[in-house]
Amino acid sequence: MKATKITYKKDPMGLTPAQIVNELNRFIVGQEKAKKAVAIALRNRCRRKRVEGNLRNEIVPKNILMIGSTGVGKTEIARRLAKLTNSPFYKIEATKFTEVGYVGRDVESIIRDLVEIAVNTEKTLAKTEVDINAREKAIERILDSLVGKTSSSETREKFKEKVLNGELNDTEIEISVADTAPIGGGSFEIPGMPGSSMGVLNLGDMIGRALGSSKTKTKKMLVKEAMAIIIPEELEKLIDQEKIIQQAITLAENDGIVFIDEIDKIASAPSSGAKNAEISREGVQRDLLPLIEGTTVNTKYGQVKTDHILFIASGAFHIAKPSDLLPELQGRLPIRVELNSLTKDDMIKILLEPETSLIKQYSALIGTEDVHLEFTASAIEKIADYAITVNLEVEDIGARRLHTILENLLEDISFEASEMKGKKITIDDQFVENQLSKIITNLDLAKFIL
């Protein structure tokens, strides 16, 4: 049955586990055990916040290990859960990290990135609260440039109305704006660490800005361009940066969700003989231990405790097994959830049922060209059939196979849609077979195309 959006009875602790599962059902097909596990984990967070006294600090989240092939919904469940609660969410592959002392990223960067996301979330929220005030101040600065600071209130009102109506959008003005040039004299990449850089700082600029003497420069620009620059400037002035940082740290510590994908890739399979690789993998696992158990990480915003951050790890575990992880790490991921491989019925449901299903997405895209796309039930079944066949014969990538199949199926229509305005195109099983049968039957070709 198709999941629909429901208005729930207000609960003082937020959504109940059943309501969370129902919300996830709107976007994700099947995997009830995984949905139930994350729903309980989320509800327990709310329960913990209502526990009195010192006991609250002793209650830690039960971290989750999801086991299942790629494309079965592991990442999507965690991502939708974070959206549902407006929690800071950070996804990273375990293979991105190396043991401390080796070249590469260290695991503490997970928390630094999570806090950065939390700060941006809090900043966006704070800006919406002062948006009207910031716009008013921006308009006043525009008026100062247009009619001067000493102009009469009557003149300012007339020009203000014109600014609001957009009549003066293309009028050129001269206005002072913040100098956004970076502090210092450029940067250089740190050898052996791609993507990282070290800046050369200008001490005079730094001291000047620290004392509040931020630089401005006068520029000529159109009114509409000035508004786009000045509003963000005024927003930054109105929000309390220190308060935002404190709220962001609290948000990350109590509501943060970290999703570590491909954790099976750092497990040490007994059959593998590469000793150097094993040392590095085991080192990453050991570095993850304190982070998941609870430690304090230094960030540019201050110290962040990881005790109550929810960690969700996932992996396919085709070669290694969960028992190949370090025993200590296994103990810190007490909830194990195995996700099922997708069946033909699951594929059909994925194509049709979610609110943002692939069929709805493609129909909406082609619909922008005034072309009506319609899929018959037999066509949907055929697409699901082909997806399962290729997954079995080539490699099982789960629901992601549907993306490649639909792209190939609709390639000609997408290319020609702009010349087909007003037309209705019906995709039936015969159309699907004509477009894809040659590729499906030639497995060597399917490996490269699908």
UniProtKB/Swiss-Prot annotation:
HAMAP family: HslU. PANTHER family: ATP-DEPENDENT CLP PROTEASE ATP-BINDING SUBUNIT CLPX-LIKE, MITOCHONDRIAL-RELATED (PTHR48102), ATP-DEPENDENT PROTEASE ATPASE SUBUNIT HSLU (PTHR48102:SF3). The keyword Cytoplasm applies. Signal peptide: none annotated. It is found in: Cytoplasm. GO terms for cellular component: HslUV protease complex. GO terms for biological process: protein unfolding; proteolysis involved in protein catabolic process. InterPro entries: AAA+_ATPase (IPR003593), ATP-dep_Clp_protease_ClpX (IPR050052), ATPase_AAA_core (IPR003959), Clp_ATPase_C (IPR019489), HslU (IPR004491), P-loop_NTPase (IPR027417). Its main location: cytoplasm. A double ring-shaped homohexamer of HslV is capped on each side by a ring-shaped HslU homohexamer. The assembly of the HslU/HslV complex is dependent on binding of ATP. Belongs to the ClpX chaperone family. HslU subfamily. The lineage of its organism: Bacteria, Pseudomonadati, Pseudomonadota, Alphaproteobacteria, Rickettsiales. ATPase subunit of a proteasome-like degradation complex; this subunit has chaperone activity. The binding of ATP and its subsequent hydrolysis by HslU are essential for unfolding of protein substrates subsequently hydrolyzed by HslV. HslU recognizes the N-terminal part of its protein substrates and unfolds these before they are guided to HslV for hydrolysis. This is ATP-dependent protease ATPase subunit HslU. GO terms for molecular function: ATP binding; ATP hydrolysis activity; peptidase activity; proteasome-activating activity.
